Amino acid sequence: MTAQLKKDTWTDVCQLDDLVPESGVAVRLGKTQIALFYWPKTGEVFALGNTDPFSSANVIARGIVGDVQGKRMVASPLYKQHFCLETGQCLEDDAVSLMTWPARLEEGQVLIQQP
């Protein structure tokens, strides 16, 4: 899926039906790959950079989601580092984090805010 980049706006990147509950889906926004995670119990969508900072591979959307230290997280499928879904912070290395974007659901669409 590819969406056009619009500065300072909310951009429609996919439909809610395209997301898999408690799992990841990758989308492209301009030249940027973003991993989306949908938490149906709370109705939240999380948008993180899809590039694993330890391997430079675009694989975060394929990671396993769960709970570590009371935080919802995704584990990189390559080297297994855990990243907080809310902040993108690596739980094993405070110096490393994934980019994050504000995300929301609106009328069955998934929107990401561009800075």
Feature roles, as predicted:
Residues 1-12, 16, 20, 115:
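A boundary/linker detector
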Residues 25-115:
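Rieske [2Fe-2S] iron-sulfur-binding domain
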